[in-house]
């Protein structure tokens, strides 16, 4: 059970950091 909890926390932290950077500096996609 602990492995699941640690994995959930790790994914959640990475997700928050990713979305924070993504919304702070939106990537400019060349069409």
From Swiss-Prot:
The chain crosses the membrane at residues 3-23. The keyword Repressor does not apply. GO terms for biological process: photosynthesis. It comes from the Eukaryota. Belongs to the PsbT family. PSII is composed of 1 copy each of membrane proteins PsbA, PsbB, PsbC, PsbD, PsbE, PsbF, PsbH, PsbI, PsbJ, PsbK, PsbL, PsbM, PsbT, PsbY, PsbZ, Psb30/Ycf12, at least 3 peripheral proteins of the oxygen-evolving complex and a large number of cofactors. It forms dimeric complexes. This is Photosystem II reaction center protein T. It comes from Ostreococcus tauri. The lineage of its organism: Eukaryota, Viridiplantae, Chlorophyta, Mamiellophyceae, Mamiellales. The gene is psbT.
């Amino acid at each position: 059970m602990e492995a699941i909890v640690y994995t959930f926390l790790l994914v959640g932290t990475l997700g928050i950091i990713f979305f924070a950077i993504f919304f702070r500096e939106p990537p400019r996609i060349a069409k």
